[in-house]
Amino acid sequence: MWKEAAAEALPEVEFRAPVDATALAEAERRLGRGLPAQLTALLMETNGMVGEYGTDVVWSLDRIVEQNLLFWSPGTFPGLYMPFDPLLFFGDNGGGDQFAFVLTPERPDIFVWDHEDDSRLWAARELEDYLHRSLAGSGDWYR
């Protein structure tokens, strides 16, 4: 389902080998929280997606874990940004802005974090909507 949705928006989208349940369980253990169901389903089909110009529209599971652990660490950006704890980052636009699920309160919407002004803006209704918008759009499609 996820590969088909992505290829519909951008036939040249690149896929990776899927992750297995063991890798997902280990990732959730390291993160200390569960992954959103839509993201889990996508990762079980493909371990990330690469769009035009090598943009990591959906990161690999390893990158999701590493980036979120970094952003959730209290010493990473002390006093520079609002807390990232409610967010789970999973992709970017290739220019520094990152896309995330909101974990607290849990909702299916995708938000974008602007690294220049620390704003967090709504970008898509859910993951499939995000894939269509990000893969078919150009530039800063979410603005």
Predicted regions and their residues:
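A surface-exposed partner-binding patch
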Residues: 1-98, 141-143
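Sequence-level motif detector for i,i+2 pairs with an aromatic at +2
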Residues: 85, 107-108
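Short, flexible beta-strand-to-coil junctions
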Residues: 91-95, 104-105, 115-117
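Short conserved micro-motifs at the rims of enzyme active sites and ligand-binding pockets
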Residues: 100-103, 122-124
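A short, sequence-level motif marking secondary-structure junctions
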Residues: 104-107, 127-129
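Long, low-complexity acidic/proline-rich regions
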Residues: 108-109, 120
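Compact, glycine/acidic-enriched structural inserts
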Residues: 118-142
